[in-house]
């Protein structure tokens, strides 16, 4: 069996396009109060400092903005984005389809990411 060439899409058919990888994404969840939340430097600075973590490392808003930018881009509208992979700082990798609709508000985005 022959290995797929780099220009083949994820389903195995030759196709041009782009694959984006968001590396070291800070999408860490923690139990804050009654439920789980995505940690971020604006809402949880005291929690992060209490646990010996640098609040500057917790910026899920950057991931949110990048996903919106990629999925709203002319490249995606032209059908040239094949996939977006998000690799978190906790070594979790997941794929986001180019047809996915990312919530416009950061709060709803965090709510969705907690459910994953």
Residue ranges and their predicted role:
Residues 2-116:
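RNA substrate-binding interface of SAM-dependent RNA methyltransferases
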């Amino acid at each position: 069996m022959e290995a797929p060439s780099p220009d083949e899409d994820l389903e195995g058919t030759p196709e041009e396009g782009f694959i984006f990888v968001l590396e070291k994404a800070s999408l860490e969840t923690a139990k804050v109060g009654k439920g789980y939340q995505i940690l971020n430097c604006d809402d949880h600075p005291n929690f992060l400092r209490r646990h010996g973590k640098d609040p500057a490392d917790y910026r899920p808003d950057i991931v949110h903005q990048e996903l919106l930018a990629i999925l709203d881009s002319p490249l995606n509208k032209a059908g040239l984005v094949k996939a977006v992979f998000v690799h978190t700082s906790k070594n979790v990798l997941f794929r986001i389809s180019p047809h996915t609709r990312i919530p416009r508000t950061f709060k709803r985005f965090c709510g969705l990411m907690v459910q994953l």
